[in-house]
A protein has these predicted regions:
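Flexible, glycine-rich beta-alpha linker
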Residues: 81-82, 99-103, 127-144, 201-202
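Conserved Rossmann-fold NAD(P)-dependent oxidoreductase catalytic core, especially the SDR/UDP-sugar
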Residues: 59-103
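Conserved beta-loop-beta element that borders a ligand/cofactor-binding pocket
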Residues: 77, 112-137
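Active-site helix of classical SDR
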Residues: 103, 107-110
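NAD(P)-cofactor binding segment of oxidoreductase domains
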Residues: 26-31, 45-72
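N-terminal Rossmann/SDR dinucleotide-binding element
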Residues: 1-30, 241
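C-terminal substrate-binding subdomain of Rossmann-fold SDR/epimerase-dehydratase oxidoreductases
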Residues: 13-14, 152-253
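Short alpha-helical oligomerization interface
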Residues: 40-57, 92-100
C-alpha cells in the first residue's frame, strides 16, 4: 500500500459483499475486474474459495455494473482453454473451445460465461481478455517465479514439479496492462481478446519450467530439487494474440 501512486484509494473488502461493490462501482466510471483466487495449488486444496471469489464475486460485480451502467473489463486466463501437447505448433485463439482442467480454471471459465450472459441478457458494456502467464515486480509469493526466488533467498532449494518440461507463454505485467488499456480504449463491447507476448506462429515467448528455474538458480547461485508433479498439470500454453495486434494495434514491449 505504501507504493500506491497519488490519487489511488485502497479499499479492503470482500468482492462478494454486494453493498460495498455497489458503492464502489457507482462512484467510478470504469471497472477492471482483476479480483480472483488464482493459484492452482490452492484450488486443489480448497476449491470452495475459488467458487466464492471467482464465480460469486464476478456475479456481484456484474450486478453492480448493471445497476450503475458502468463499463467493465473482465480479466481472465489462458487456462480456461485447457492445455496443448508438448512439441506442437498450435495455439489458443478466441474461438478455442473451453476445456478447463483445474478448479481454478473451471471457475474462471464460468466467470467468463457469466460476463457474456450479462452482456447479452442485460446489455452490460463489457469486454474479456484471456492472458498467458505473467511475471514482474511485486508478484505474489505463491506464483512460480517469486516462489523460487524466495526459496533461494531463505536458504531453501527451488522446487520443480516433475520433469519441468511444461511450457509456458510468458508476458511482463506491464505489457499485460498496456493490452488491457488498449481494449478499454479501442475494444468492441462484447468481444474477447487473447493477450500473449509470442509473435504469431513463433512461440518466441515460450520457456519450459525447467529453463526458468535453471536461469534463476544460475543468476542467484542457488540449487533446485524435483518434487512430485501437480495433479492434472497442464503441459503447454500458447496464445495467439493476432486479433489484439491487428484490430487494436497492440504489441509487447
Amino acid at each position: 500500500r505504501a507504493n500506491l501512486p497519488e490519487g489511488i484509494e485502497f479499499v479492503e473488502g470482500d468482492i462478494c459483499e454486494q453493498s460495498l461493490i455497489d458503492e464502489l462501482v457507482a462512484a467510478n466510471d470504469t471497472v477492471i475486474h482483476f479480483a480472483a483466487e488464482s493459484h492452482n495449488d490452492n484450488s486443489l486444496r480448497d476449491p470452495s474459495a475459488f467458487v466464492h471469489s471467482n464465480l460469486v464475486g464476478t456475479f456481484a460485480l456484474l450486478e453492480a455494473v448493471r445497476k450503475s451502467d458502468k463499463r467493465l473489463h473482465h480479466i481472465s486466463t489462458d487456462e480456461v482453454f485447457g492445455d496443448l501437447e508438448l512439441g506442437g505448433t498450435d495455439a489458443f485463439t478466441e474461438t478455442t473451445p473451453y476445456n478447463p482442467s483445474s478448479p481454478y480454471s473451471a471457475t474462471k471459465a464460468g466467470s467468463d460465461h457469466l460476463v457474456r450472459a450479462w452482456v447479452r441478457s442485460f446489455g452490460v458494456r463489457a469486454t474479456i481478455s484471456n492472458c498467458s502467464n505473467n511475471y514482474g515486480p511485486y508478484q505474489h509469493i505463491e506464483k512460480f517465479i517469486p516462489r523460487q526466488i524466495t526459496n533461494i533467498l531463505t536458504g531453501q532449494p527451488a522446487k520443480l514439479y516433475g520433469t519441468g518440461a511444461q511450457v509456458r507463454d510468458w508476458i511482463h505485467v506491464d505489457d499485460h496492462n498496456d493490452a488491457v488499456l488498449a481494449i478499454l480504449e479501442r475494444g468492441c463491447i462484447g468481444e474477447t481478446y487473447n493477450i500473449g507476448a509470442s509473435s504469431p506462429g513463433s512461440g518466441d515467448a515460450h520457456v519450459t519450467n525447467k529453463q526458468v528455474i535453471e536461469t534463476i538458480c544460475e543468476l542467484m547461485g542457488g540449487e533446485y530439487v524435483h518434487v512430485a508433479d501437480r495433479p492434472g498439470h497442464d503441459q503447454r500454453y500458447t496464445m495467439d494474440a493476432t486479433k489484439l495486434r491487428r484490430e487494436l494495434g497492440w504489441a509487447p514491449k
